[in-house]
Amino acid sequence: MHLSQLLACALLLSLLSLRPSEAKPGAPPKVPRTPPGEEVAEPQAAGGGQKKGDKTPGGGGANLKDDRSRLLRDLRVDTKSRAAWTRLLHEHPNARKYKGGNKKGLSKGCFGLKLDRIGSMSGLGC
C-alpha cells in the first residue's frame, strides 16, 4: 500500500513537471500597437507651431480636447461589425410577428386543436 502511494505521487510530480514545458511554445508575446490616430498626430507635433486658424496664443486646450476625442474614437467598437454580430446572433427583431402567422395553419392539423393559452397542441389525434 505504501509503495503504491509513493508511485502515485511520483507519477503526479512527473506529470506536473511536464506541463509547464508544454505551455512554453504557446502564442508569441504581443507587441503593443499604437492606434492609427497617434501615428498621424506625432508628425504634426514634430512640425512645431500652431495651425493657421489658431488665434489663442497658448492653443494647448484645443489640442488636448482633440487628443481626447481621438482616443475615445479609437477605443469605440466598430459599429458596423457590432451590428453584423447582433443580426447574426438574433434572428430577426420582429420574429414573433412572423411566427404568429404561420401557426394559424397548424390548428387544423392531425394532432389536435391548439390550446390558445398554453400554446401547445391538445393531443386529441386524427
Curated annotation (Swiss-Prot):
Keywords of this protein's UniProt record, alphabetized? Cleavage on pair of basic residues, Disulfide bond, Hormone, Osteogenesis, Secreted, Signal, Vasoactive
Q: Main location per UniProt?
A: secreted
**Keyword Transmembrane helix assigned:** no
Name listed for the protein in its UniProt record = C-type natriuretic peptide
- Signal sequence residues: 1-23
Give the family this protein belongs to, as stated in its UniProt record: Belongs to the natriuretic peptide family.
Q: Where in the cell is it found?
A: Secreted
Annotated S-S bridges? 110-126
An individual GO BP term? growth plate cartilage chondrocyte proliferation
Q: Which organism is it from?
A: Ovis aries
Which intervals of the chain are annotated as region Disordered? Answer: 20-71
Propeptide spans which residues? 24-73
- Please list the residue ranges that the record marks as compositionally biased, kind Gly residues: 46-62
Per the record, its GO cellular-component terms are: extracellular region
